[in-house]
Curated annotation (Swiss-Prot):
It is found in: Cell membrane. Keywords: Cell membrane, Membrane, Transmembrane, Transmembrane helix. The chain crosses the membrane at residues 2-22, 33-53, 58-78, 97-117, 122-142. The lineage of its organism: Archaea, Methanobacteriati, Methanobacteriota, Methanomada group, Methanococci. Its main location: membrane. This is Uncharacterized protein MJ1358. It comes from the Archaea. It comes from Methanocaldococcus jannaschii (strain ATCC 43067 / DSM 2661 / JAL-1 / JCM 10045 / NBRC 100440). GO terms for cellular component: plasma membrane. It is a multi-pass membrane protein.
Amino acid sequence: MGVVFAFGFYLIFIKLTGLKLMDYFPRFKENRLKMIFSILSVILAFLINWLIMKNFSFLIEIIHPIASVWIFIILIYLLLRFLFLKRVPLSNYEKKFMGNMSAIAIFLELLKIIEYVDEHNIASPITVALVFFIPVVVFFNCKYFYEMELSS
């Protein structure tokens, strides 16, 4: 099961971003960052698999900080690009990577909301959704404004 889980994360983090592991070896110096991301994604897959096997509730507790940090990093990256590289459009790799990061962050936030609602028996899931989705909405607004700024 661990190998299947790791392969699934390999597909999510590597294949969906348009990367191929075999492309790194002929020109490793040019693609060091992509190689590091691929290695880290496989390590993350095994770590998450181990956490699921050991204690699922511990996994739920780390989901929200991971998603929040990803959203925060993406916002800072977009802000820095907007401030210093106004005329440089996002590359296809950056667009795919940011789209996948935001989709994974939203998925992790949804898992946290479901866990929070189940734990506290909240009558109004709308309140919980508003509290947890504010960073996601801010991220998407910043992304669309940034894209509009580049296209004008």
